[in-house]
């Protein structure tokens, strides 16, 4: 028995990799390496690529860099994957402008984070997201709730009020609980495609109605994550659980400190010279790097 029929549509597939941004030795964006990495991720099972999200270090990229990166990835993968642009801001006017520009350069969708630092009330969040949706009415949007970083949480009831915006099609749930998925499904029904925003919660979230994951770990474990999701969707829950349990050490190692510090180190260990994160982020401490290297080695043997 497959579970596909009970799930919402998957507007961006099952696995969207939140791409790192490669930097060269001078700290400049390495657009050629970004293109190579994008093609590799698609070959490893990614249905979509998110450019300039949290993992892509958007806070330390200029908007000019972000647009050029989006264009480079879009050109690199062509029609083989959907490309989403991170266009969120705590300024509604800036988010509107960024989303329009992303649509103009060929993005397939935009990830729009809940505004950070200024902590708007729920009424303000509804106005914010409605303005973005109306500014780019043909661009599919994924709302992004990550209160641990933003200091602000969007309620399921507020999301439900936005369901009259036809291009708000999905939601990245990164509050750290499966209860968020349940609340969203009760409020919005199957109209809203919910993606796990936490690799370690992908399988639990699938079990309560999520359709996929916006993944960091898929940089280095794309086939294994694909196998886990496919097994679950095909009703092979035991196989999915076994794959999930094999991946848990990797998930822990990749989030032992602030993302994307560990995943950039993991890519370096695997031969991808993506460079260190831009300050104020730092390189991975040596002890954590050793643990990560051992975890990657063990995963390759499974």
Curated annotation (Swiss-Prot):
Pathway: Amino-acid biosynthesis; L-lysine biosynthesis via DAP pathway; (S)-tetrahydrodipicolinate from L-aspartate: step 3/4
Keywords: Amino-acid biosynthesis, Cytoplasm, Diaminopimelate biosynthesis, Lyase, Lysine biosynthesis, Schiff base
Location relative to the cell: Cytoplasm
SUPFAM superfamilies: Aldolase
Top-rank lineage group of the source organism: Bacteria
GO MF term list: 4-hydroxy-tetrahydrodipicolinate synthase activity
One GO location term (cellular component): cytosol
Active site: 144, 172
Binding site for pyruvate: 55, 214
Enzymatic reactions: L-aspartate 4-semialdehyde + pyruvate = (2S,4S)-4-hydroxy-2,3,4,5-tetrahydrodipicolinate + H2O + H(+)
Entries under PANTHER family matching the protein: 4-HYDROXY-2-OXOGLUTARATE ALDOLASE, MITOCHONDRIAL (PTHR12128:SF66), DIHYDRODIPICOLINATE SYNTHASE (PTHR12128)
NCBIfam families in UniProt: dapA
Function of the protein: Catalyzes the condensation of (S)-aspartate-beta-semialdehyde [(S)-ASA] and pyruvate to 4-hydroxy-tetrahydrodipicolinate (HTPA).
Annotated protein name in UniProt: 4-hydroxy-tetrahydrodipicolinate synthase
